[in-house]
Amino acid sequence: MPKQLQVTEQEKIRREKLEELKKLGINPYPAELFPVNNFSSKLIEDFEDKQEVIIAGRIMSRRIQGNASFAEIQDSKGRIQIYFNRDEICKTEDKTKYNVVYKKLLDIGDIIGIKGSMFKTKVGEVTVLVKDFTLLNKALRPLPLPKVDSEGNEYDSFTDLEQRYRQRYVDLIVNSHVKDTFIKRTKIINTIRGFLNDRSYLEVETPILQPIPGGATAKPFITHHNALDIPLYLRISDELFLKKLIVGGFEAVYEFSRDFRNEGMDKNHNPEFTILELYVAYKDYFWMMELTESLIEKVCLEVNNKTEIEFDSKSISFKAPYERISIIEAIKKFTNYDISNMNESELRLICNEMSIEVDDSMGEGKLID
């Protein structure tokens, strides 16, 4: 028999509310257009008193105070405060929409659409006066929102790394900085693509399923092609196919590819990942250095509007050109070890002295890396 879904007490209550909404003739999941015409961040930045707006978002907090209530909704651009007044929403004697639907049947996590007008509270906070609202999506599971005590200490935050990775959709809702990372990643890829396209480099797509896994040393994922009755491998690299295109007559090709490696994993190593590979004919690694400098500077400027960033309490400049130094010189500069004439056993001894984790499979090259 299939395993029965375990439902928490909160989830039971939300399901009961769902049925109550249906009894009132309210569709909790309407497949209809809701004509959003603005976003939270724009309304805050370009505040205009009494401006009529239509917005939508997820309820993230509520403060119910009798016939009037404040709440906060979150859309794709940020959060904004909204103000519910019973008599503004319910113009007739029937106060069900406020007294029952809003106060009793809505929960944090529900998505609502709002029609209203802009104003500022006495303390100057930009707020939407709700004139009408529509339930767009009833959430059946509570959000893992943190609790804050009177002294501002936060508890029960959604910080477990394993859970965050497995439930990215929840992570995006409750940790706003994660959404910023997604947005920056897209900006980075778009900037790189534009940079290479401006130089007339050709973006291509190469096979993901390959008869021979090549281009790197890694353990592949294996599958089977039923029609041909042959084993195939998810690519570990797109290098060989890109080089074949150069052989075929293209002088500059690149690809953003999804590669797969059936090996160990941690927060920095995923079994599937995106990689950029670029091949250009008639160039050398000095030319590639210059291209890389220009590319990284361009990306940093486009994403951060400046070429200098703060990381781990340090200021890092991505303004080209960069210092060029050999790996042997770099090791000597930062560790005071001259490894230019060292053998494998001597390199291994230095790694142990510096508490660098190594194993017996590593040769001179890996130890230097």
Kindly give the residue locations of the regions a language model identified.
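Class II aminoacyl-tRNA synthetase catalytic cores and aaRS-like
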Residues: M1-D369
